[in-house]
Amino acid sequence: MIFDRTVTRRLPQARLWICLAAAFAFCVLMLPAAQAATVQPLEIVTRNGVQVFSVEIATTEQEKETGLMYRKELADGKGMLFDFSPEQEVSMWMKNTYISLDMIFIRADGTILRIAENTEPMSTRIIPSRGLAKGVLEVVAGTAKKYGIAPGDRIGHPLFNGK
């Protein structure tokens, strides 16, 4: 029997490429599901009523550092909630952020501490919380004015005292 070594060497390589392609396809298919899992509802209770938002949650250092950078748009009713547990002085900026935002600084009890409205895109100017904040909600600029959101209003989300 004649034994061809080139064929036997190619079989493991072919299997490796098939496995790598399958793993890549699996990761690509699972990516939207992983991103969708980080989106949660958030309520803001104002004098005008309750406004419900769908927010991405930024908890890791990488997520907090990147935030909404490089995004070209943010729909009304969408946003990103940054978890800065435990409550602390927080500073934000707009570096590499193409869209103007309203930044809502939130205390540990869920009350709004301060709102920085209509932030300047791409700016490296520091935007401080001016007090202790456990979270920051970023929404498209004009949202606070549109819905009458003001300091003292309440946020309903599990990050704030489990509510």
What role is predicted for each listed range?
Residues 17-32:
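Bacterial N-terminal signal peptides
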Residues 5, 32-36:
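Long, non-catalytic terminal segments
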Residues 3-21:
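Bacterial N-terminal signal peptides that target proteins for export
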Residues 8, 31, 87-89:
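Short linear sequence elements within intrinsically disordered, low-complexity coil regions
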Residues 36-163:
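Compact, glycine-rich, soluble single-domain proteins
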